């Protein structure tokens, strides 16, 4: 396995002192890069992720081009679902489309047991390739969290208000619990397999869970997240686990009492107030990705965020959501350089 010579990200995830703030960007690998767009002329997303050499190349690009302090595996949160019998297609301009959406108990019952080594060996091969030969920074594996996966599976695709998902949850609580159990087992096994293959940390993407109230989260979602985190920690107790959601500041207190290591926040919450809600966790975030298209605003916001981030150990610079396709790669390169240089100065000042 390649020795990790830049462990700033892992130190920050453990709330240890660092000499500069680590940075990586959600969706740093992919759609904003010319090299990736050229690949997409020939291959679909799933075709790229099924070819370890190509997928590893895409994953490593931002490390080489931007100088980020961590790589995140290039794949989609939908990747494991076909292994459970879900007929999913990624449609250009739309996103994931489910051709056999969940509507009844029978639909949930049909979901099959997911075995990562059998269903997604190409994901594990990509991780091994990166960890063994290609990276000197930590590699982050990830999975979609059960609520977000269920929202696609029930709605049949992207949704603005998740009313089909929430009404199913309210109307069929026992069936919902079975669905969460199946997705939770899949997610735990998937994350454990990624760490076994060489991932240094893992992130749970619960992109749409902010649509729920805190009371609904505590009743319908918290049990499965606790199960996932506890199962991963039982096998890999020192591997950092990150929780990332959008528009979910009202749920921060729920995550404070779980054995998570890092909590991602978006631009709706400041780093300072987030720390008050999750004092035992490292914080990741929280630049609005829209500012990447407005350079002066981007630098001003980055400076403000860094001033808050350096006040305590355990801060990782990131976006509050993914990089937009329109963002020039040069902007991410310049921003990374600014974060590294500026944070080093600020930390020396103390």
Swiss-Prot record:
One of its GO terms (cellular component) is cytosol. Its EC number is 4.1.1.37. InterPro entries: UROD/MetE-like_sf, Uroporphyrinogen_deCO2ase_HemE, Uroporphyrinogen_deCOase. Its main location: cytoplasm. One of its GO terms (molecular function) is uroporphyrinogen decarboxylase activity. The lineage of its organism: Bacteria, Bacillati, Bacillota, Bacilli, Bacillales. Belongs to the uroporphyrinogen decarboxylase family. The record marks 76 as: Transition state stabilizer. This is Uroporphyrinogen decarboxylase. Keywords: Cytoplasm, Decarboxylase, Lyase, Porphyrin biosynthesis. Substrate binds at residues 27-31, 46, 76, 152, 207, 321. PROSITE patterns: UROD_1, UROD_2. It is found in: Cytoplasm. The keyword Cytoplasm applies. It comes from Listeria innocua serovar 6a (strain ATCC BAA-680 / CLIP 11262). It catalyses: uroporphyrinogen III + 4 H(+) = coproporphyrinogen III + 4 CO2. The keyword Lyase applies. Homodimer. The gene is hemE. Pathway: Porphyrin-containing compound metabolism; protoporphyrin-IX biosynthesis; coproporphyrinogen-III from 5-aminolevulinate: step 4/4.
